[in-house]
Amino acid sequence: MYILFEGIDTCGKSTQMELLTQKHPGIITTHEPGGTAFGQQAREILLSDSLRSKRAELLLFLADRAEHYEEVVEPNHDKIVVSDRGFVSGIGYALANGDFDFDELVALNRFALKDHFPDRIILFMTDMETLKQRISEKELDGIELRGLEYLLRVQEHMKESILKLGIPHLFIDATDSIENIHQSILTYLKV
């Protein structure tokens, strides 16, 4: 089973992945970008926000996604693989950047993922107040420097994309307690 934990920065995905693997050590965890050797190099470029072209940024994310799928997800198709981010983030950020068509983005991601979208998606949804508080506690990367409104637009595009695609999903209130969120995830995944 291939599962995505999706959401904007500081929404609690990584914390929940840690809790899930503590409870179920057999689960394979990974992340995009950066879940492969190539992905780590791509991640450095992407987080530096040094690319002027949003198309180049999109293509680098897609190259990472294709490599990640082939190197991590596909060989473990008989196991539970949980990725901190994936194609939904890619579509959400691309739509927030403007000048991209949803159907085109879906087609490009289908190609990168060999036509294998995740079996389930968990989207962590936050609000302006929580985002502002959590962002203030960390050093910002190039993408986070685009602003809070930008990040919340990305989040809305993620939600809309999941609904349009009809992939089984759970929307989580990321402002809830860590324990309540964890319990909701366990119940949804039935693990």
From Swiss-Prot:
Among Gene3D superfamilies, the record links this protein to: P-loop containing nucleotide triphosphate hydrolases
Q: What is its EC number?
A: 2.7.4.9
GO terms (molecular function) for this protein are: ATP binding; dTMP kinase activity
Which SUPFAM superfamilies does the record match to this protein? P-loop containing nucleoside triphosphate hydrolases
Descriptive protein name:
Thymidylate kinase
Any one GO CC term of this protein is:
cytosol
User: Would you indicate the residue range of the signal peptide?
Assistant: none
Q: Which organism is it from?
A: Sulfurovum sp. (strain NBC37-1)
Q: Which Pfam families match?
A: Thymidylate_kin
